UniProtKB/Swiss-Prot annotation:
It is found in: Cytoplasm. GO terms for biological process: L-histidine biosynthetic process; L-tryptophan biosynthetic process. Keywords: Amino-acid biosynthesis, Cytoplasm, Histidine biosynthesis, Isomerase. This is 1-(5-phosphoribosyl)-5-[(5-phosphoribosylamino)methylideneamino] imidazole-4-carboxamide isomerase. It is an enzyme of class 5 (isomerase). It comes from Pseudomonas putida (strain ATCC 47054 / DSM 6125 / CFBP 8728 / NCIMB 11950 / KT2440). The gene is hisA. Signal peptide: none annotated. Pathway: Amino-acid biosynthesis; L-histidine biosynthesis; L-histidine from 5-phospho-alpha-D-ribose 1-diphosphate: step 4/9. Belongs to the HisA/HisF family. It comes from the Bacteria. Its EC number is 5.3.1.16. Disulfide bonds: none annotated.
Length: 245
């Protein structure tokens, strides 16, 4: 399982939100490229970037920062989400050296767009499903739909999606542990690999994901925990690599 540091971008700075609320943000660095360097030097094997302004505006806003990080680390897999709602945007990021684009809101509102994107950019598309009580949320989590996460995930199985990033909104940024039972249920219900996100606080939460014994869970995204020092990236990755269960 991969430990994937998150860099959330707002107005060019690296921030963390609590439960997706833009007004409840903490600035951790005004130099996201240096922050990326810190996690790379700490041994991370993939980075998770989110354009928070983009998620709310429906188009990239912090694209220059993303490009700068991708250029600095051409051999590091980078995934970017937030405001990706057109093939042009995907093409822009792929040309900039980004490995994966995460389609969120558009995947819920227009599921056929995912198939289109996978066809145009095979192996590059991840679907981001953010949920509250098992139902999918969209538009920077401002709206909760009547669509169930597992039902929607199954729709994408035939499209060639590389992974699903599953985030439990109630847990995100709260450092109270991630929703292991639902993450496991999602991983077992679909053939698409799942990346867990939201709520990871310490090594115990990483162990809980591994103890779930769901081979489909291939990664865990962590944000606030690594910024506030309750989780060490290198230690957590070593723990995953050596886990015997």
């Amino acid at each position: 399982m991969l430990i994937i540091p998150a860099i959330d971008l707002k107005d060019g700075a690296c921030v963390r939100l609590r439960q997706g609320r833009m007004e409840d943000s903490t600035v951790f660095s005004d130099d996201p490229v240096s922050m990326a360097a810190k996690w790379v030097e700490g041994g991370c094997r993939r980075l998770h970037l989110v354009d928070l302004n983009g998620a709310f505006e429906g188009q990239p806003v912090n694209g220059e920062v993303v490009t700068a990080i991708a250029k600095r680390y051409p051999n590091l897999p980078i995934q970017i989400g937030g405001g990706i709602r057109s093939l042009e945007t995907i093409e822009h990021y792929v040309k900039a050296g980004v490995s994966y684009v995460i389609i969120g809101t558009k995947a819920v509102k227009q599921p056929e767009f995912v198939a289109e994107a996978c066809k145009a950019f095979p192996g590059k598309v991840i679907v981001g499903l953010d949920a509250k009580d098992g139902f999918v949320a969209t538009d920077g989590w401002a709206e909760v739909s009547s669509v169930q996460v597992i039902d929607l995930a199954k729709r994408f199985e035939a499209d060639g999606v590389s992974a699903i990033v599953y985030t439990d909104i109630a847990k995100d940024g709260m450092m109270q542990g991630c929703n292991v039972p639902f993450t496991k249920a999602l991983a077992e219900a679909t053939r698409i690999p799942v990346i867990a996100s939201g709520g990871i606080h310490n090594l115990g939460d990483i162990k809980a994901l591994l103890d779930a014994k769901a081979p489909g869970i291939i990664g865990a995204i962590t944000g606030r925990a690594i910024y506030e020092g309750t989780l060490d990236v290198a230690e957590a990755q070593a723990f995953c690599d050596n886990y015997q269960g």
